[in-house]
Amino acid sequence: MKGGVFAPQKEAETIIALKKAFGPDIPVRIDPNATWTLETSIKYGKVLEPYIQYFEDPCKGQQTMGELRKVLKTPLATNMCTTSFSEIPGDILYHSDDIILADHHFWGGMEATMQLGKICSVFDRKLSMHSNSHLGISLMAMAHLGCALPEIAYAIDTHYPWQKEEIIKGGRIEFQDGALSVSNEPGLGVEIDQVQLKKLHQNYLECGIVDRNDEIEMQKVKPGWKVSENIW
């Protein structure tokens, strides 16, 4: 569950309610997007220990996450404080997480993500994958990595169900029981639909956004919204 939106107590109560509703076989996670202070993360991390599979980026920075890890039993996951090979030394120094949520775009592609898996195995880290909004090419790259990386110990994330359009032939990729089948076709097993690609490229040209700006999307829902840190 994406957190850092409502008061931490309300979000903790929501997680507990979800876990009780889903039952013991469905894992639940929370990601406050580093908006909680260390003190808040400790307080509600202890409350949530019996309910969550892992605790993703509750507070900001490797050193702060390392302090949190000293007092919680729940595994800590990140796709914010360790996102590149240059940040691995700090990750090891502070033991800021137990699970690195790799994004194959940020880490440098599929081969680089495979290398990350080997580093995780050396330093006793688990691996899963982070997803932002993406289309079928990126999704299938993720699926292939999920099959190829033995270090992946948790179901990987995707925002794909939020997307309505697609640029690959055959349209949207279907999930079956929460999983994807990896194609036996060459490469990623998908082909580009040139008509759809041209259409979405035109959307890009017309939208006027050339850099990522999460505030614009949020302001559609809440005018005046600004990115904040340690707001709770």
Locate predicted features:
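Shared catalytic-loop signature of beta/alpha-barrel
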Residues: V47, K60-A77, T82-G187, E191
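Short, charged N-terminal helix-start/capping segments
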Residues: P32-E49, G117, N213-E217, V221, ...
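Structural signal for hydrophobic packing residues in well-ordered secondary-structure cores
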Residues: K19-F22, E49-I52, G146-P150, H201-Y204
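Extended hydrophobic packing segments that form well-structured cores
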Residues: L188-W232
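Metal-dependent enolase-superfamily TIM-barrel catalytic cores that perform enediolate-based chemistry
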Residues: M1-R69
